[in-house]
From Swiss-Prot:
Protein's job: Participates in the innate immune response to microbial agents. Acts via MYD88 and TRAF6, leading to NF-kappa-B activation, cytokine secretion and the inflammatory response. Plays a role in preventing infection of internal organs of the urogenital system.
Domain TIR per the UniProt entry, residue ranges: 759-905
A single GO BP: inflammatory response
The protein's name in its UniProt record: Toll-like receptor 12
Similarity comment: family membership: Belongs to the Toll-like receptor family.
Membrane topology annotation: Single-pass type I membrane protein
Organism whose genome encodes this protein: Mus musculus (Mouse)
Reported effect, residue 804 to H: Fails to activate NF-kappa-B
Effect of inactivating the gene: Has increased susceptibility to the uropathogenic E.coli strain 8NU. Following infection, kidneys show a significantly increased bacterial load and increased inflammatory response, whereas bladder shows a similar response to wild type.
One MF term in the entry's GO annotations: NAD+ nucleosidase activity, cyclic ADP-ribose generating
Oligomer status and interactors: Binds MYD88 via their respective TIR domains.
InterPro entries named among the record's database cross-references: Leu-rich_rpt, Leu-rich_rpt_typical-subtyp, LRR_dom_sf, TIR_dom, Toll_tir_struct_dom_sf
Amino acid sequence: MGRYWLLPGLLLSLPLVTGWSTSNCLVTEGSRLPLVSRYFTFCRHSKLSFLAACLSVSNLTQTLEVVPRTVEGLCLGGTVSTLLPDAFSAFPGLKVLALSLHLTQLLPGALRGLGQLQSLSFFDSPLRRSLFLPPDAFSDLISLQRLHISGPCLDKKAGIRLPPGLQWLGVTLSCIQDVGELAGMFPDLVQGSSSRVSWTLQKLDLSSNWKLKMASPGSLQGLQVEILDLTRTPLDAVWLKGLGLQKLDVLYAQTATAELAAEAVAHFELQGLIVKESKIGSISQEALASCHSLKTLGLSSTGLTKLPPGFLTAMPRLQRLELSGNQLQSAVLCMNETGDVSGLTTLDLSGNRLRILPPAAFSCLPHLRELLLRYNQLLSLEGYLFQELQQLETLKLDGNPLLHLGKNWLAALPALTTLSLLDTQIRMSPEPGFWGAKNLHTLSLKLPALPAPAVLFLPMYLTSLELHIASGTTEHWTLSPAIFPSLETLTISGGGLKLKLGSQNASGVFPALQKLSLLKNSLDAFCSQGTSNLFLWQLPKLQSLRVWGAGNSSRPCLITGLPSLRELKLASLQSITQPRSVQLEELVGDLPQLQALVLSSTGLKSLSAAAFQRLHSLQVLVLEYEKDLMLQDSLREYSPQMPHYIYILESNLACHCANAWMEPWVKRSTKTYIYIRDNRLCPGQDRLSARGSLPSFLWDHCPQTLELKLFLASSALVFMLIALPLLQEARNSWIPYLQALFRVWLQGLRGKGDKGKRFLFDVFVSHCRQDQGWVIEELLPALEGFLPAGLGLRLCLPERDFEPGKDVVDNVVDSMLSSRTTLCVLSGQALCNPRCRLELRLATSLLLAAPSPPVLLLVFLEPISRHQLPGYHRLARLLRRGDYCLWPEEEERKSGFWTWLRSRLG
């Protein structure tokens, strides 16, 4: 599998998508779809504003997370067996959805939320698996007009309800054997199965169903179909009569017999019949008599050797006739003795064996507008052949020898606008009447190889010109006239052409030229031969330039000086015999209006910011079949001026540390969308680790990534140093606290917390070293002294009664559990002492959680805000307000304190 990187930053005018790091999705605007159309095989809808294609999908939810929510077209390919409910509910504006996911079932509600969807397609390998669709699968698709299911087999009794606005239904490459099975799959099609009187489809496509051989009588009763496509199926058209179709206008079919589908034509009064790639051979008069309703008849590649007499007379309404790819040796369409006139407007006789056209070949076709005679064996043409074709607009004679053309051979065609003479051996005449009427605007012509310079006489007011150069042509051609004021499109195919423009430059000869295509051309004839090697044709109105090299360019030609150029395509400019690497700035110069740039097999090796500084309007950059690309780090600083879309397709980035900066940069990019499809493995990597191999290679081998590793290591060290005080705090407080709680819980399980037990101490006194003086001088005499001055209680003081050598936590726990009452002496210093905090926290926890909690008394030696106490202690104060007291400074109030303490200690 290839490697895909998807890195965001879409156009600011589009909803910005963030968080994309890697994906196998490609997004584009509809206007730019032709640049990347190969990745949108199933949804080539350039009228949509925004499209996305995702390949190798295995986790649909994860894949769709990176797709912009505003896409109108979505193509998905991969392996996802089940479509879950609300699978596309995040895309309410979706209009076209194509799924090639090897689906086996759609769960109810899978297409919920797609109220604007107009076209839905399911694709799979033919006859491989079944697709389960619930009856209400399309109930939410209120705008659906087109439904295509190609490949999977449907249940014959699925009972799927169709959206009311559906106009186009296709079930192709499936297991269907009988047309009547459609009634079980889609019962709405049959009259009486729903509230509709009858269903009308613009097109029903059943093509390429290799098992389709039957049509059960009455199975589609009442259905109205404008176009029915049965091409590449074994079903004979004669079966269609009994289907019960209320209407059928056009039929695409193949016939298993050597007969025209005349019965179907007569039964439905068809307006169109297209029978291709069938062995008809000849047409009988009986079959011809049934075709009087036809307006279109297509009989391409049907093995016809001749046409029956009265062929056109039998079809008075016929407007379009296609007879290409047959074995006709003569075109006897018009019978002079009858004088009948046909309404035919289009006639295609291409690919036959016509050598000579009779004088009256087209005499009955005064309404003919398009005549196609390509790839026959015509040797000569005379003007009288076209005398009756006063309305003819298009004449195509490509692929005929045409060794002789009569004088003024096109003079009889005043309406002719398009003429194609490619792949002919025509000898052009300088006489003014050679090209016929002045309305000729589009001309395609092959120039013969000449031993000496020659003048190329052309119509002056052409708008489109295509010139193919014969191999071996090396001499100059001088154009006549010297100016073509209306020419907008020029295509030159083949190398060796040298146009002599006289004293004028190209802009003077072609002042209106907007589109220029140079095919199979090395550009040597269009570039200066000095050190600069600049493109010579300075055309101020040129908007599109396409160059397809012949693989023999000696050096790059700099395309510059075209102020209106919007689209530039350069392909196959790399020399096959002497390949060399080039920089983008050697190919593209100052093009201020350029919006789309496509480079394919040009030898490009690196991209730098310098190349983009003269391309201020560039929006799309496509790189195809370029090897070992390096992206210079100067692009990092130039990021705000980068194109909105960069596609690196079927190309590979060099496994070089110069590219190490790129991955983190593109992940942070906020304006440029970059899609990289790279199939290459770096040295030392196997096929199993191909995905993401370049990033892993750069991570392991490049000093830039070593610096990153050192940065991460130092960051981890700093983090650890910051965390040490926290760990120390946990060691001094929370860990002992948890240990103590565990011991209390464990002793409770062992029965040591029973109410009847005898206590070793009456009071456990918790205090800090700073408060020890108050405990000894004030508290100890009052509690341990004998009556009447004291209470005669036994106190547990940590400094005096803790067992030497025993763990502090164990001493605290044992002493608390061995005391009837816990007395915490609190002050500012005590709250900062770790042991006092532990004792207070433990005592509070026992008060709140123990099944037989001890008495907890709090003595505050100084005023302390409750916000200074931990949460547990604040809660304890709120629960038992009588268990705490403040030590008074005034002597007269101390007796009240001792009275409170004696009452609490009983």
